[in-house]
Amino acid sequence: MGPLQREDRPALGGANVAPGSSPVGVWHQPQPPKEPAFHPMGWSLPKEKGLILCLWNKFCRWFHRQESWAQSRDEQNLLQQKRIWESPLLLAAKENDVQALSKLLKFEGCEVHQRGAMGETALHIAALYDNLEAAMVLMEAAPELVFEPMTSELYEGQTALHIAVINQNVNLVRALLARGASVSARATGSVFHYRPHNLIYYGEHPLSFAACVGSEEIVRLLIEHGADIRAQDSLGNTVLHILILQPNKTFACQMYNLLLSYDGGDHLKSLELVPNNQGLTPFKLAGVEGNIVMFQHLMQKRKHIQWTYGPLTSTLYDLTEIDSSGDDQSLLELIVTTKKREARQILDQTPVKELVSLKWKRYGRPYFCVLGAIYVLYIICFTMCCVYRPLKPRITNRTNPRDNTLMQQKLLQEAYVTPKDDLRLVGELVSIVGAVIILLVEIPDIFRLGVTRFFGQTILGGPFHVIIITYAFMVLVTMVMRLTNVDGEVVPMSFALVLGWCNVMYFARGFQMLGPFTIMIQKMIFGDLMRFCWLMAVVILGFASAFYIIFQTEDPDELGHFYDYPMALFSTFELFLTIIDGPANYDVDLPFMYSVTYAAFAIIATLLMLNLLIAMMGDTHWRVAHERDELWRAQVVATTVMLERKLPRCLWPRSGICGREYGLGDRWFLRVEDRQDLNRQRIRRYAQAFQQQDGLYSEDLEKDSGEKLETARPFGAYLSFPTPSVSRSTSRSSTNWERLRQGALRKDLRGIINRGLEDGEGWEYQI
């Protein structure tokens, strides 16, 4: 049930009955509202029946339902309160008035199964308000109420057990279970769906409700009474999946461990490996959602420490579900294809960053550089074929004085005669074969990922996929036009040249300095520039029409920039981009309105809108620059996964070591050696920079360098000094520096070092 307001009212006695209600609490169903006689916009509806009228009525009903979901829910909750006050039985259950409830239940005419506006019974209301005494009276009088679900669209399927569980009323849960309440009942109402406007998602079963609210006692009670920990909701999510989606990470980790302790060995597959309808296990879902706390918690359960030697620790990390080798839906691919920015933070976690670094340095970067070099040579070959395309002098007479064409395309029979033509033919065949290979490589990925994900994800190179596929089609169109002797091959050839060379920017993602800039360009084009083009089109249409009207009566020979409407549009576009200056002829008098209109156009277009575009692009650059390393790391992962799928296995061996060598089965592991004292010198520099008093923490830093750094908490106590009384701006600056210092110290002392993609010696990988 929804969040109802608890109103302070006097206890309901035997005579205190709502006005207009029967003393026995019989509740009558309200009449359904009548259809409106008029359309919401004021149009009367015809009375004749027919297909058009039926469609019209459906459209009107659909238009009526386009109100806010939250507003509809609020109205139903208000109606629910009204119905409760109109029904003595429901009101007694709400007020926990056991005496009045007993009197009402003794009347033969009392309908104990009556329902409120949400389809709730009196037992639902008693459970909602934690009224244990009223609930016991109702269950004694009508035990079947325990099994009754709510019937409204919002709360369909919810039983009293669901409500008692979510309120953490342990005594009521015990009473309901003792009377046979179903532990497998499913709450399928729209309130319980996983939607953006829903504030909670607790699944559908009472067990998932109990796990999400963090009640360990209720979880144990439900499991003891037969609750299935492997039960899945309509989305295929188990209780472990649902815990991943909860905001309270601490309770989620505790409940996760508790539920796994009940997962016996009578199943072939562990509960952690049960996928939902999207094929995601709880571990993969944690990565896709960017739940770092749960991801680290699960990784702690999957790692095996080999040995510890002072500050050195050798750890084996299980790569199951992480590595893209042998997994069509690996965690690496899921992270780079999701739209959630938080998921990219998983790429900075151990062992994901080490695995990505290992793959990129060993195989990804060399193969990607070779692929880029091959493509550049290929596009140069295609360019040379276009530059030296077969042409011959034009022999037809020119009738149009403005036509200055001198050469024309050769026929197919004349195009391949000389040895120079044969050499060009080899290049053309290479270009055609390359275009076919591009289509064969790209099209399968479209069907595998879907059109939206393949072309819409910037990290995957979405716009570049559009460019390269369009380029390949233009090459094939040029070939067809050449074979059929159709004039105009210059059109697809020109498009192919522009697109082919623009696609060279795709290979900039292999370099940390250039990769993020390609994303900036994409975001500016498809974000800032697209929005700006709408405004620019409106301004150009308005002023071009004005210029055309002004010069409509003038001699076009003296000033022909706005002679006809298409020319006026093009000239205004050039003026907007300041490609040309304002047209003027000082030998004749120009219309006065031209000067006024052009002055307004110059102010709006040049001074206002162009500077607005520059400001928008600057803001986009600032936002992307703050995510530069994160975006480049995601580009590296996407490129690595792409190359791994395309190349044969003999050219890309699997990374890691097989668990059979360590008695860990057939799973693959990555061994990471962590040295926590690598950044001690950098810590000392930070500490000296922020030192403000004598030797409060320098003695600790001068201790034996072999001593193991445990946590940052003791250093935080030594390095926290009282802030002197200074101005507000100085205090704010000091606070920010303090946060920076604390963050740097605590991060380094924990041994969490972001060196997954650097060339330094911060991490060592031994395979």
From Swiss-Prot:
Q: Which residues bind Ca(2+)?
A: D581
Coarsely, its chief localization is: membrane
**Effect after changing Y586C:** Abolishes channel activity
Question: What keywords are assigned to this protein?
Answer: ANK repeat, Calcium, Calcium channel, Calcium transport, Calmodulin-binding, Cell membrane, Glycoprotein, Ion channel, Ion transport, Membrane, Metal-binding, Phosphoprotein, Repeat, Transmembrane, Transmembrane helix, Transport
Annotated localization: Cell membrane
Which residue intervals are annotated with compositional bias (Basic and acidic residues) in the record?
Answer: 1-10
Q: Which residues lie on this side of the membrane: Extracellular?
A: 388-424, 483-488, 552-564, 585-595
Residue ranges of ANK repeats:
84-114, 118-147, 156-185, 202-231, 235-276, 278-307
Tissue specificity annotation: Detected in intestine (at protein level). Abundantly expressed in pancreas and placenta, and to a much lesser extent in stomach and kidney. Detected in kidney and duodenum.
PTM comment: the record says: Glycosylated.
Which Gene3D superfamilies has this protein been placed in?
Answer: Ankyrin repeat-containing domain (1.25.40.20)
How would you describe this protein's topology in the membrane? Multi-pass membrane protein
One GO BP annotation is: calcium ion import across plasma membrane
Q: Which domain of life is it from?
A: Eukaryota
- Glycosylated residues, chain numbering: N397
Q: Which residues cross the membrane?
A: 367-387, 425-447, 463-482, 489-508, 529-551, 596-616
Q: Mutating D581A: what's the consequence?
A: Abolishes binding of Mg(2+) and increases pore diameter. Impairs intestinal Ca(2+) uptake
Instruction: Point out residues bearing the modification Phosphotyrosine.
Output: Y201, Y202
Q: Which InterPro entries match?
A: Ankyrin_rpt, Ankyrin_rpt-contain_sf, Ion_trans_dom, TRPV, TRPV5/TRPV6, TrpV6
Q: Where is this region: Interaction with calmodulin?
A: 133-143, 689-707
| Recorded coiled-coil stretches | none
Q: How does it assemble?
A: Interacts with TCAF1 and TCAF2. Homotetramer and probably heterotetramer with TRPV5. Interacts with TRPV5. Interacts with S100A10 and probably with the ANAX2-S100A10 heterotetramer. The interaction with S100A10 is required for the trafficking to the plasma membrane. Interacts with calmodulin. Interacts with BSPRY.
Q: Which family does it belong to?
A: Belongs to the transient receptor (TC 1.A.4) family. TrpV subfamily. TRPV6 sub-subfamily.
PANTHER family xref list? TRANSIENT RECEPTOR POTENTIAL CATION CHANNEL SUBFAMILY V MEMBER 6, TRANSIENT RECEPTOR POTENTIAL ION CHANNEL PROTEIN
- NCBIfam families from the xrefs? trp (TIGR00870)
Q: What is this protein called?
A: Transient receptor potential cation channel subfamily V member 6
The gene designation is Trpv6
